[in-house]
Amino acid sequence: MQLTSFTDYGLRALIYMASLPEGLMTSISEVTDVYGVSRNHMVKIINQLSRAGYVTAVRGKNGGIRLGKPASAIRIGDVVRELEPLSLVNCSSEFCHITPACRLKQALSKAVQSFLTELDNYTLADLVEENQPLYKLLLVE
């Protein structure tokens, strides 16, 4: 299963924020510079992460963005569920004439559930804590 770029960059943004010293704010511009993604795309991602409670956005001169909850409380599977459209195939009868008898959708649904269940075993903290190579690449040592 390949994640959309929206989910990919959402996870990367969270990884970046989790790599910063606790409580330190960053900016959308800083995140876009680190990953080379368009600002408009990142704004949409951060807005959705903020609505879901994963990111806190503070407006104003001293504002910015930071994690909305501890990295240890953010399950990767939950983030993917929030950001990723998880429908792998279009099974409407208008697009596929075998829909009434097809078992593929059920098989794919079970596969997606297994994928998400595995991701639920990891928190954001698991991905970033004591990961010196990551800090070095993100320039947040």
UniProtKB/Swiss-Prot annotation:
UniProt KW keywords = 2Fe-2S, DNA-binding, Iron, Iron-sulfur, Metal-binding, Repressor, Transcription, Transcription regulation
Show the PANTHER family listed in the entry: HTH-TYPE TRANSCRIPTIONAL REPRESSOR NSRR, WINGED HELIX-TURN-HELIX TRANSCRIPTIONAL REGULATOR, RRF2 FAMILY
Q: Which Pfam family is one of those matched by this entry?
A: Rrf2
* CC cofactor note: Binds 1 [2Fe-2S] cluster per subunit.
Can you give the residue ranges of the HTH rrf2-type domain?
2-129
Q: Which domain of life is it from?
A: Bacteria
Chain's role: Nitric oxide-sensitive repressor of genes involved in protecting the cell against nitrosative stress. May require iron for activity.
Q: What GO terms in the biological process aspect are recorded for it? A: negative regulation of DNA-templated transcription
Q: Which amino acid positions bind [2Fe-2S] cluster, per UniProt?
A: 91, 96, 102
Q: What is this protein called?
A: HTH-type transcriptional repressor NsrR
A cellular component term, taken from the record's GO annotations: cytosol
Q: Which cofactor does it need?
A: [2Fe-2S] cluster
**Annotated DNA-binding residue span(s):** 28-51
| Species assigned in the record | Escherichia coli O157:H7 (strain EC4115 / EHEC)
A GO molecular-function descriptor: iron ion binding
Which InterPro entries does this one have? TR_Rrf2-type_CS, Tscrpt_reg_Rrf2, Tscrpt_rep_HTH_NsrR, WH-like_DNA-bd_sf, WH_DNA-bd_sf
